[in-house]
Amino acid sequence: MAAKIRREDEVIVLTGKDKGKRGKVKQVLSSGKVIVEGINLVKKHQKPVPALNQPGGIVEKEAAIQVSNVAIFNAATGKADRVGFRFEDGKKVRFFKSNKETIK
């Protein structure tokens, strides 16, 4: 099945502590999760690695979020939208369900 949310898509968070925030998808994981830029930040306690000249400390990084908790953001309407699929010139393309506009 084709992916409704892909890398570089702008998404909006539907539920959780970051509800309403927008960001770009950095990575789509096979476990049904996505990593979104600037969303679901967690503090990671990192040990120093002298061999790589890497300092230790507390680092903030993005954690994965369920793909069902995000929706693609439609810039034309300014709201979250649903994704549909259709064939154009023999190719399967994604489109916004609200205004039938093709995605990228």
Curated annotation (Swiss-Prot):
Residue runs in coiled coils: none
UniProt keyword annotation of rRNA-binding present: yes
CDD domains: KOW_RPL26
Gene Ontology molecular function, alphabetical: rRNA binding; structural constituent of ribosome
Stored InterPro entries: KOW, Rib_uL2_dom2, Ribosomal_uL24, Ribosomal_uL24_CS, Ribosomal_uL24_KOW, Translation_prot_SH3-like_sf
Source domain of life: Bacteria
Biological processes, Gene Ontology terms: translation
Keywords (A to Z) from UniProt: Ribonucleoprotein, Ribosomal protein, RNA-binding, rRNA-binding
UniProt xrefs under NCBIfam families: rplX_bact (TIGR01079)
Similarity field: Belongs to the universal ribosomal protein uL24 family.
HAMAP family reported in the protein's UniProt record: Ribosomal_uL24_B (MF_01326_B)
Subunit structure, as described in the record: Part of the 50S ribosomal subunit.
UniProt cross-references to PANTHER family, sorted A to Z: MITOCHONDRIAL RIBOSOMAL PROTEIN L24
Protein name: Large ribosomal subunit protein uL24
